[in-house]
């Protein structure tokens, strides 16, 4: 793992030099602020929490994560760059982790830029900052899980339109799973519904979003991240044979 920091810094610099990064982060922050202020009832309730604001994140991440994911492996799909990477003493795990962590940091920066809403909530009323902290952590974990999915899809193909369709389609499917569960509740066997509930990241996020940051739910997101990063590493190893 000696070269992991090198990969991390290189990807972070790549994001910093790409105008699309700033556009996607700005769009995420502005939409968070606009929708959070206009649709959240917490302004009327004395600013006690940011519950509705955080409920928007699974949908807003569809824009941000998709944009960041498409930049992860774009350079390495170039034959010259791919051949050069083969000559360097860099393992696939280092490449995957370094790039993923850099993208996750950008997500964290975008999330941190929504902090003024926390200031507003505290100004308007007695906000529960412990719950808000838990909500921010939950949102960060959700972003990491979405990003790991995008990382895997981008390792499969270099065609941006295919990446866009697959990433958006898969993340939309995941995001709408809870709605499908409501429809299946009285039509499917209970064990099927329970199994799908256990796999639904939105319901998990909803639990964390309520301020209940349990080890069980946190491990779910960590496991999802590790699973898709492992799948990404396997895919890259197969393609570089």
Language model region names:
Residues 41-42, 47, 51, 166-235, ...:
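Terminal transmembrane helical anchor/hairpin motif
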Residues 34-37, 44-47, 53-54, 60, ...:
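Secretory targeting signals
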Residues 49, 68-86, 100:
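Transmembrane helix boundary and interhelical loop/hinge segments in multi-pass membrane proteins
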Residues 1-23, 241:
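Aromatic- and glycine-rich beta-strand/loop motifs that create alpha-glucan
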